[in-house]
Structures are given as C-alpha cells and as structure tokens.
Design a protein with these regions (language model features):
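N-terminal mature ectodomain segment of secretory-pathway/periplasmic proteins
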Residues: 405-479, 506-512
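Buried hydrophobic packing residues in well-ordered domains
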Residues: 4-6, 26, 40, 52-56, ...
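Short beta-strands and strand-coil junctions in structured, solvent-facing domains, enriched
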Residues: 62, 66-67, 147-148, 160, ...
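Gly/Pro-enriched, hydrophobic low-complexity segments
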Residues: 456-461, 522-611
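An aromatic/glycine/proline-enriched structural segment found at the starts
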Residues: 138-203, 364-394
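Non-catalytic, conformational "gating/processing" segments within enzyme and secreted inhibitor domains
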Residues: 94, 121-157, 357-358
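M16 family metallopeptidases and their MPP-like homologs
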Residues: 1-10, 17-62, 74-82, 88-114, ...
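Flexible, processing/modification-adjacent segments and terminal tails
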Residues: 115, 398-412, 469-534, 542-544, ...
Length: 612
C-alpha cells in the first residue's frame, strides 16, 4: 500500500520549498504536475516548460519526505478503508484481484488497516531511491518544441538525477482456475449483487491478437450497444448496465478479462447465466457483419479523437518503446482494426473468452444467493481481504421465544421500561470525522414525540431537522423544506425516546424471522412493520439482548438501497440507562459513518421553543 502514497509525498514539497510554496509556483505557471508510483505527468504553456521541468527535476533530486504528510495520508487511507468495509463494489474489487493474482502478486495486494500501519517513511524513501532512476525511465514530450530544445531543457533540469542499478523483481505467475469457481463476499441485506466473471489473461501489449480481442470484447460488453447490456438491461431489466473489459499486461498472466453487472439480488443467478451464455455465444457463432462493422467504426472514431489529446500521443510513444511493440503499431492501428473479420473474433473468443474457466465473484447477501450459485461451480465464502470464511450456521431457534419478548429484553437490558418512561427530555451529542473535518450531531428529544437534530461543523449548522410532534421541516444551506405526509410519519416514529418502546405500542407489527450471525455472534432478526408501513429489520444479540444492528431499505433514483446501522459497546449512562458508545452507519449518501457518543443529558428541562 505504501506505493500509493509516493506521488502525494513527492508533491508535498522539496528540501527548499514547502508544500504551499511548491503548489504556489505551479499555480503561477498555470501548470499541472501529477506523480504516481510508476510515472510523472506534466503540462504547461510552452513558455513555462523550462520552469516546470525545473520543478520536476527538483522533486526527483531533492524530495522532502514529510512524516506529517505521511501520517495524514495514512489517516485518509484508513478512512477510505472504513467506507470499503460495507461497499459491495470495493468487496468485489478486492476478491477479484486476490482470486485472479494471489496475495503474493502485486496485482493481488489489498490494502488493509494492518498493512497501512506497517507503512513507514523509511520504506517510502527506499522505494523512491531504488526505482525512480533515469536509466529505467522513458520521457515523451508533445507540443510546439523541437528535439534540440527538448534535449537542452531535459539535460539542464534532470542532469543531477543519478543513475543507479535497479533490481528486477520477479513474481509468482498467476494461474487461471481449473474450471468455473464461485467466490462470494457477504453483504447481509444487500438488495443488489455485484457480479464479476473474471480470470487472468496472458497477453502482452502489442500482441498480434490484442486488437482482435478488443473488437471481440467491445461486441460483448463495450458499452450500451454491447450484448451484455442489451441482454441484462434492455431485455431483462435486471441491472442498470452490464459490461466487459479486457486488459493486456507485460507480466505473464498479468492481464485480465472481466464481465460485470450490478444485478438485483433475486436475479443474481440468472444474470450470471446470461453473462456466461453471451460469452459462449461469441465462441460458437459468427458475429453478424453489421454488428462487427459497427464496433470497428466506434473503435476507429475513439482512436482518432484520442490523437487530439497530447497525453494520449505521449502514452503511445512510450508504449512502443517500453513494451517493445512494433514501431508501426499505432501507425497501422486503424488498418488493423478494419481488417478484423468475424472469423477472427470467433477465434480469439475461443482462445481468450472462457466461460467454463473463470472465477465468478459475487458481492451480495449470501443467504439469498449462495445456494443458487452452486450450479455454476463450487462456492467459497470470503471476507473483504480474501480470507476464506468458515460458514458456521447460527444456533437453532428456541421454542419459547417471541418477537415481543426479544424487544422487551432489549428494553430491560438498556435500563427497563420504568426507567425509560421517566425520561421527559434527552440531549445526545455524537461526533464523527469526515474528510479530516470534525462534525457534531446533536439530537434533542422531548416527550411525547418532539425532536431536533442539529448537524454542525466548527460551530456552523450544516443541517437541521425539526419536528414539533405534529409537523416539521428540514433546513440547511439557506434552504428550508417542510415535511410531506410520509416524512411526518417517519419523524413521528423517530422522535420516540426509545425506539423499542414504540415497537411495543399499538400500530406496530413484529415478526421473528430467525437467528442470523452479526460479527460472528448469534442475533435474533425481528422484522418491524411500523404504523406508517415502513419496514425495518432489527437484530438483537441472543446473549445480551442488546440491539446490535438495523437494516432499512428505501427507493432512491439509483434504485433500492439498504442502510445498515451497527450499535457497539453499550455502557452505563445517566438515569440508569445504557447507550451504545459507537454507532456505525453505511449505505447512506455519505458512505460509512462512525459516530462516537460524546455526551448524554436527561431531564434538563428542554423548552418547547426549540422545536418551532
């Protein structure tokens, strides 16, 4: 993971310039300079090119690796990692990389909190000093400049950059699966499954089959006209889109093929079946000429447009040198695209598109999909980091338990009905961090059902939710919106001092659905149908009675989404009550949020005026 930090560290100042001074010079030049772990990109007006190259040369010869900057990057990485813990897309990316390449291959490495903690400034320095050397670098300059001018500027500004022997690393060669194999990463309650049919591919850049396979891949899943999109979305409406991609690579089996879809949970197995069917069809049937010509025309058009971008021209020039490609590869690109025949497409499909030899990865609700996936191959459950999860079944349901008694047990565990009924008002303050900024969330409730939520940052209110028991509104950034009928019912429920006491009131229906695992512990799953018709799944720890998780789905412009909330570390609070010290929430518009309890005040005499 430390290689991902190199670019940020290098552009955080030099030994003679602070980060602000460095960025100010770039701004004054109107220039761009971005650095990754494998290269540098720069852009400026011609008159400023010498000054920009001087800045880049300074970065390469006298970088200032800052511990403060590294600490900030590690903190940001951990924050992003926390969001990934409940993100099916991230789950899919991780497990796909690990299965295709293995954990000991650089392409199969997955960042974890443990790996972030191991990153040191010394390791970052050593990587830079070892691999950032001119004798293994290529430079392409595109613009209104001749060779003599370019050579003079490069020699002037990079002359102090020292050559050094660079070690050549070797890696274990990835192996395609022996047949079809299914890998599932569980996302309990997910209403969609992220599907990927994938495997490593052995093809170097510039190989004779590369252009032919690009045509084949485009016909299969290169966009909205691709067969996957037309099948899964237009014909069956299982997904918003389905696509395929192919990537060549200089390492043996370092390339990959991938056919993806974000399918409704109920259609997960059907989506996989149709993806495999379309892959096989390309191997066994000649592509109609109009479809073939249509995609070849598209490739020709995008290639021509790409030539207008100087960055693309630079990349092409470097590719031919770096990968030892034919010198006329790009010169003859359009001619070679046009020469691809339907027979060529079928032949490369038979060679490289292998539905029977693939990893079928699915990030979704294993309870809903695992059994159905067995028809495609052996099923293995993995965690986010690619470790095999032992699928231990939950305990059997006791015969003398009911949904009502489970909810009552939670009330008793958190203080009891009598203690909760003595609460006339309560102010709960929680804090969280988002993108390095501290945010406070203050929630004030007053019996019977008044509520005020104030989200603020550095003393400035970002959003308010106000409900006076009958009506309410939401305000923020100078805008105010009154609640509609559905919102009024929603916040009337949320204004209850204890959610569980509201569940036992008339109008709510409780249904015990079984026992599920929550963080390896057994929990009763109770489906609650509120008086307003909304449904929420609540999970209560079998041993302690505490609520440990909630799931609620809602329709959004992007489709149905599930918001999951975890309640952790119940501790004694005021009034003889117990409260979770940490609440984690995912699936909302802001990704994963971790809120920590700062304070709770009870019966302080809250005025009705604040709810107006």
């Amino acid at each position: 993971g430390f290689q991902d930090f190199i670019g940020e560290l290098l552009t955080a100042g030099t030994k003679s310039k602070t980060k602000d001074e460095f960025n100010q010079e770039l701004d004054m030049l109107g220039a761009t300079l971005s650095i990754g772990n494998d290269g540098i990109y720069m852009q400026s007006l011609k008159k400023n090119s010498d000054k920009l190259l001087a800045l880049c040369g300074e970065v390469l010869t006298s970088p200032n690796f800052s511990q403060e900057e590294l600490d900030k990057l590690k903190k940001q990485a951990k924050s992003s990692l926390a969001n990934n813990l409940d993100d099916p897309e991230a789950m899919s990316r991780n497990i796909t990389s690990i299965l295709n390449y293995g954990k000991k291959h650089p392409y199969g490495e997955v960042m974890s909190e443990k790996s972030i903690d191991k990153i040191t400034l010394e390791r970052c320095k050593k990587f830079f000093e070892t691999y950032f050397r001119p004798n293994v670098a290529y430079m392409a300059i595109v613009g209104d400049i001749n060779l003599a001018e370019a050579k003079a500027q490069v020699e002037k500004n990079f002359g102090k950059w020292e050559k050094k022997v660079v070690p050549v690393s070797t890696y274990p060669t990835p192996k395609p699966p022996a047949g079809a194999a299914v890998g599932i990463v569980n996302k309990t309650g997910a209403v969609q499954s992220v599907i990927d049919v994938t495997y490593p591919v052995n093809m170097k850049q510039g190989s004779p089959d590369e252009i032919k396979l690009k045509v084949a891949n485009g016909i299969l899943g290169g966009g909205s006209t691709g067969r996957l999109f037309q099948n899964l979305r237009e014909t069956h409406a299982w997904t918003y889109g389905s696509y395929s991609s192919f990537r060549s690579d200089e390492l043996p089996y370092g390339g990959s093929f991938s056919a993806t879809a974000n399918s409704t949970t109920s259609a997960s197995d059907s989506s996989v079946a149709e993806i495999l069917k379309e892959m096989n069809k390309l191997r066994t049937e000649l592509v109609p000429n109009d479809q073939l010509q249509g995609y070849k025309n598209y490739m020709a058009g995008t290639f021509a447009l790409g030539l207008e971008d100087p960055r693309t021209l630079a990349r092409y020039a470097i590719n031919e040198k770096k990968y030892n490609m034919p010198k006329d590869y790009y010169k003859n690109y359009l001619k070679n695209v046009e020469a691809v025949t339907a027979q060529d497409v079928m032949e490369v499909a038979k060679k490289y598109i292998t539905p029977g030899v693939a990893y079928i990865t699915v990030a979704g609700d294993k309870k809903m999909i695992a059994e159905k996936m067995k028809k495609f191959g052996p099923v293995t459950i993995y965690d986010l980091n690619g470790n095999i999860v032992k699928d231990t079944p939950p305990a059997a349901m006791p015969s003398n338990i009911s949904a009502t008694s489970i909810v009552q047990k939670h009330i008793d565990a958190t203080g009891g009905t009598a203690a909760w009924q003595k609460v006339n008002d309560m102010i709960m303050v929680m804090n969280m961090e988002m993108q390095g900024m501290k945010i406070n969330i203050s929630t004030t409730r007053k019996a019977p059902n008044k509520m005020l939520v104030d989200v603020n940052m550095m003393g400035n209110s970002l959003q308010k939710i106000v409900f006076d028991g009958n009506k309410g509104y939401m305000s923020g950034q100078g805008q105010k919106k009154d609640f509609d009928e559905l919102e009024t019912k929603k916040y009337a429920d949320e204004a209850n001092m204890s959610e569980e006491l509201g569940y036992l009131a008339p109008g709510c229906k409780l249904s015990l659905k079984g026992i599920e695992k929550v963080d390896d512990a057994d929990a009763y799953m109770v489906e609650v149908t509120k008086a307003n018709g909304e449904k929420v799944s609540e999970y209560y720890d079998v041993k302690t009675g505490f609520k440990v998780k909630s799931e609620e789905s809602e329709d959004t412009p992007e489709g149905k989404q599930t918001q999951t909330t975890y309640y952790l570390d119940y501790q004694d609070g005021k009034g003889g009550l117990k409260f979770p010290q940490i609440i984690k929430q995912s699936g909302g518009p802001m990704g994963l949020m971790e809120m920590k309890l700062q304070s709770i005040d009870i019966n302080t005499g809250v005025s009705d005026e604040i709810f107006k």
